[in-house]
Each structure stands twice: as C-alpha cells, then as structure tokens.
Amino acid sequence: MPGITISKKDFLNSIHQKLSDDEIEKILFSLGIEMDIICEDTGVVVYKLDIAANRYDLLCLEGLAKIINTYLHGSSIISKPIIRKSSIKVIQESVSKRPFIACGIIRNARFNYKHFIEYQDKLHQTIGRNRSAVAIGTHDLDKFYNGKPIKYKTIKLNKLCFQPLNISTEIKGTELKTKLGCHLHQYIDLLGSDEEGIIFEYDNHIISMPPIINSEFSKIEPSTTNIFIEVTGTDYNKVDQVLKLMLLNFNTGIIEQVEIQKENSIDITPVFNVTPYVFTIDEICKKIGFLLQPDTIKLCLEKMQYAVEIKNDQLIAIPSYNRLDIIDKCDIIEDILIGYGFENIPLDNPIEFYTIGKENDLNKFSDKIREEMAMMGFNEMLTLTLLNKTENIMHDYMVEVEYPKSKEYEVVRTSLLPGLFKTLSINQNVKLPIQLFEISDVVLLDSYNKSFNKRFLTGVCAQMNSKLEEILEVIISLFKKLNLIVEFTNIITDSDNIFLKEKWEKYFIKNQTASIYVSSYNIPRTLIGCLGVVHPTINMQFKISLPISAFEIDLEKVFVLIKNII
C-alpha cells in the first residue's frame, strides 16, 4: 500500500473540523485508510497514512480532504468543476517511444506548491511505475505561451540544447548523463536510445524532455496561477487518468481541455466521461443483505462522491470524475456500505441453517506429509508459481501469462523442481547435505488444452556425491508410514510411463533414474512419480556445482488412492 505523510495542522484546517486523533483515525478507517503512526517531524505533528493501492486520488492532502469533507457533510459540500475547451493546441508528430499524450490547464489556480510537487512524485512512483509508464510535466503557462501551438516530437540528441530545471546553464543532449544529477540517470535509460530524445517545444524553446526533466524556461513557482500540465506514457488510459487526477485535486478555478492534433486524428484531452450505473432498490438490498430506504441509499452514495437520481424504483449513480477506482457495480455496492458504516450493519443471521467448516482433506494430508519430510531432515521451501519459459523445461505445453510484466514470470510451473533448483543455486554455501522439499500445486494442460491444478511433492538432495540410494531411503520410509508398498522400475523399459519419459530425458542421467509405483492389498499397482540423479546440463543451467538427486511425486494421486482406507 502506498503511504503519505501529512501535517496534522494542515489536515484539520482542510476539513474545517476540530477532532481528536482517535476521531480522525476512526473516520479514516471507515474509508479504508489506515493510520500508520502519529509522530513529530522537525517539531510538526504529522500523520503517516497507508492508502489503498487503487485510490490514487487520495495520495495528497487535497484529495484526502475532498473525500473526508464529502463523507462528513454529504452532497452539500460537492462542487462540480468548471470545464471548458482551451484555445491552446498541441501538435503531435511521430513519436514511437512514448506515443500517448494528454494535456490540460488549471486557470486561476491557488495551490500549495509543496503538496503539488509531492503529489506529482507520488503518481510517478505508483501508477507511473517510476515514469516508465507515465511521466508528468508541469509548466507556468504565462511564462511561455503567446498563441502559437506546442509541438511534441522526437529530436536527435546531438541537436538538442536547453536549460534543464534548476540548472543555471544550457546543456547539450549528449551531456545529459554527465550534467544531470544521478537521481535522473535511471529516467534517461527509459528513452531506449543514446541518439534520440522526446521533447515538448514551443516557439523553438524546449519546455520539457519527458520522462526526464522540465526546462527552467517554463518552471512553475508558488505564485503561478495558470498551470499547463502535459502527461506522456505508454498506456493511454493511465496517461488520461493521471492528467485528470492532477487537474481535479488541485483545481480551484477553471479546468481547460487541450486539443491534441495528430497525423490522422484530433483528440480533446482529458476525457471527462463518466458511466452512469443503474440499479433497482431491490437489487441493492439483495446485494448488501439487508433493507435500506432509497433516500438512505442516496445519502450513502452522496457521502462517497456520487451524484444520485432516483426514478420510480430505479437508482442512477454517477461517480465523480476523480473516482477512477470505480470499475463495476460491485464497487458502488461497497461504497453504499462504507457510506452507511459497517458498524451500523445489523447483526442478524442471514441464513436459517448452520454449517460446520473443516480443513480440506487434501490440505490436511499434505500437512502430515510435510511433518514426515521435516522429521527426515528436509527443509521446506515455498517457491514462486511463475517461471521464465526456459526454466520450465519439464514440458513443451504449459499455461502462459498473456501480458507478463517481466521475462522472469512468463509461464505457470508444471513442476516444482525448477523452483528448488533456483533455491539450491543461491544456497550452495550452506552446510552439506542440502535437503529441500516442497508440497505445492502445479498447473498442467489436458488433451483439450484446459488447465487444471495438481498437488505435487518434490524433494532434492545435494552433496559432494549424491546417489539414488539417499532418495530411495526417503521414499521407502515415507510410504511405509502410509502402509503402501513401493516399487521402483527402470524408466527406459517402462512403457506405461509416457509422462515420466518426457521428464527423465530432460532432468535425469540415463540408468540413474526410476519410476515410482505403489500398491497395497486393496490398491492396484499405480504409477505416482519418478526419481533420479539430475543431469549435468541442468546443473549448468541453474549454476549448481554440487551433484543432485531428486524426486517428484503426484501427491494428489496418492491421496486419492489411500483416502478410502484411512
């Protein structure tokens, strides 16, 4: 959860209330905001707050004060922003690196300069992903604008020369890394090129170079009254949302939309469209689990920054422009309950019968196996479910993540062994032998390409001369506790073991691997897994210098076999 630090004095002034710390904490908690700590910072009492990850509008005092004032006073405090179209135009040329832009203007602004800059930084860190997804530039419009259009374009760095923010002299584009502070170097790398940069230009003056820095030429100051805000990025929705947040939270006058002229289209930014949500009163009462009168529902929503209209049995709820966290009807139902107060919900039993919960049988069985493995000297691991595709060498068919955030998390694992190998790789300096195990789910695909979970038990043993015997003893001992007879068969001659044939060829040394079968007086001979000495190519891939013996067992299949006789 992102956090903010605000002055207690400023906070109380902004909500026009004299409240105790306990009263403030209770109000904040009702809105899903956690008071982390109350402390002094350079002689000033401050609140450190944890904000919900989807409430970017609350990451500054101004946004926080708006929701609390509305929560305390309802619709009487809501003021709709004055929005009009500006005569200012931005011409967007072909820009491939950060193709999406949105611009807007705050006229007659009266704002806290320190809060404004802090909020810009918070948006950069959160929704902006450290400026990789979104970067914000803010400018004093009166310092540079005289009627000509602003240009957004790509420029060769060797042709670039401008005076960056808070730097006394002009610098060349090729001097960015040497002349700018170290804290800006990470943003220079976001350009993706040592030869080209992106700029906003006005009348041959550079006003900003996103996502790195603005220019001294258009620097905003505490006395600035007309603020031009430009937002660039790789995702249009985020770019538009960030611009609206900056405009709405610090709007004390008029908001102006700016025309963006592209090669084949014209956009007006930001886009101030909101979706009205239509409910029946019965639908709302059914969802929340108790009866509420229409007027009460209306009041609850107005406390949460909605415009509400009731027509016959229908309720129409329109979120305010800054409620970007509203995605579906369920969010509005939640806001009704927040506005009503969870502490006010009646404690009646909503059902007429009672049930007894119990632990899932497979999980209970898994815990018993964990205890047995631990008593045999193995340390339990809990590794990541997502892997790099090259690490998941067990199968060619696997569930892939459609839009992975990183190459490290491209596919869902089909085996627990890669995770244990990665753990071994970074823990080779500990005392030998290193014995690790994991009991977790993997995700496999059936013949219809449908995914399903399987519970596996996997173990590895690494020491100077790992042998099959070490793993054999562990497996025999484990299944002896389950009253099952274990049999080991050479995989090469095991015609039934198609799944494991694919596995051993990639993981284990020939003639140092085996299939694992179990049976009992009322359980037929059943294949449950495999074991072997790990192939040196695997050691090389995961950079493990020690020999490894390993096993993998379909624990879910074992559970199905024995659950009827337990």
UniProtKB/Swiss-Prot annotation:
Enzyme class: ligase
MF annotations from Gene Ontology: ATP binding; magnesium ion binding; phenylalanine-tRNA ligase activity; sequence-specific mRNA binding
Coiled-coil residue windows: none
Record's keyword terms, sorted: Aminoacyl-tRNA synthetase, ATP-binding, Cytoplasm, Ligase, Magnesium, Metal-binding, Nucleotide-binding, Protein biosynthesis
Pfam families reported for this sequence: B5, PhetRS_B1, tRNA_synthFbeta
Recorded superkingdom: Eukaryota
Ligand binding (Mg(2+)): D325, D331, E334, D335
Swiss-Prot/TrEMBL catalytic activity: tRNA(Phe) + L-phenylalanine + ATP = L-phenylalanyl-tRNA(Phe) + AMP + diphosphate + H(+)
GO cellular component, one term: phenylalanine-tRNA ligase complex
Quaternary assembly: Tetramer of two alpha and two beta subunits.
Protein's UniProt name: Probable phenylalanine--tRNA ligase beta subunit
